[in-house]
Regions:
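Terminal amphipathic alpha-helical/low-complexity segments used for targeting or macromolecular assembly
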Residues: 1-51, 69, 75
């Protein structure tokens, strides 16, 4: 499976969790290569397949996973 995003060097902490900003590595869905997305704690928080994406300042951390064609905007998801 080809990765669709990478973790950038841009990080910040929330409630003791270190979050990484994501950057698209290829075009998919409404996302273009080079687009910056929201932030995740680990790669399992956002699937590399399908068209799912985390936008802007949205955060996904803990055991939460975004997959399928789900889009996360302006909120946090954690489990």
């Amino acid at each position: 499976m080809e990765k669709k995003y990478k973790l950038t060097e841009e990080t910040f902490a929330v409630d003791g969790h270190v979050l990484h900003r994501i950057k698209a590595l290829r075009d998919f869905g409404n996302v273009k290569k080079g687009d910056l997305g929201g932030s995740i704690e680990e790669e399992y928080n956002l699937a590399h397949d399908w068209n799912c994406w985390i936008y802007n300042d949205a955060v996904v951390r803990g055991n939460a996973t975004v997959c399928g064609n789900a889009e996360v905007e302006k909120k946090s998801a954690y489990g």
